[in-house]
């Protein structure tokens, strides 16, 4: 199954999962509610949030992978944080929420999705950081994941 999925479909799933995880961290809504918002086109209550662009409307998105990443990170975020903590140079609560979402997403893929090579996980996280995080966040994300990879994944 994994071999037949196009890389672009996985890339889109990661992008939307990152955005959903970030939203979940900010709003503290039930993860099922966040998932539904993304699956239904990203519509938010406009009185409380800005209208979002339709999330999973892109034709090439691996929706099953999106769901796995989103729910997996939400259900295991404390465990993921404890795996990340030794490799992060500052307290976890001081991380930018986008950096935290990126690191959690990548750590989930490294520890739970062994069908995805760790180098792909790191590269995808770097590319997402370049698009969604602060200017030099991709360097920080790369450093953390490079240090963590040998400890959480057999090369």
Swiss-Prot record:
Gene3D superfamilies in UniProt: NusB-like
Origin: domain of life: Bacteria
GO-annotated cellular components: cytosol
InterPro entries: NusB-like_sf (IPR035926), NusB_fam (IPR011605), NusB_RsmB_TIM44 (IPR006027)
GO BP annotation list: DNA-templated transcription termination; transcription antitermination
SUPFAM superfamilies: NusB-like
UniProt entry keywords in alphabetical sequence: RNA-binding, Transcription, Transcription antitermination, Transcription regulation
GO MF assignments: RNA binding
Protein family per UniProt: Belongs to the NusB family.
Cited function: Involved in transcription antitermination. Required for transcription of ribosomal RNA (rRNA) genes. Binds specifically to the boxA antiterminator sequence of the ribosomal RNA (rrn) operons.
NCBIfam families for the chain: nusB
Name of this chain's protein: Transcription antitermination protein NusB
Source organism per UniProt: Vibrio atlanticus (strain LGP32)
């Amino acid at each position: 199954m994994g071999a037949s999925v196009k890389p672009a479909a996985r890339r889109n799933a990661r992008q939307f999962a990152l955005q959903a995880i970030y939203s979940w961290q900010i709003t503290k809504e039930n993860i099922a509610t966040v998932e539904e918002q993304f699956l239904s086109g990203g519509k938010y209550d406009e009185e409380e949030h800005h209208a979002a662009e339709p999330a999973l409307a892109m034709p090439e998105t691996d929706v099953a992978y999106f769901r796995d990443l989103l729910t997996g990170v939400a259900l295991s975020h404390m465990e993921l944080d404890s795996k990340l903590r030794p490799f992060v140079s500052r307290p976890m609560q001081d991380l930018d929420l986008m950096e935290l979402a990126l690191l959690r997403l990548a750590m989930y893929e490294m520890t739970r999705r062994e069908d995805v090579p760790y180098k792909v996980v790191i590269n995808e996280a770097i590319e997402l950081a370049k698009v969604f995080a602060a200017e030099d966040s991709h360097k920080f994300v790369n450093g953390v994941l490079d240090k963590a990879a040998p400890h959480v994944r057999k090369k």
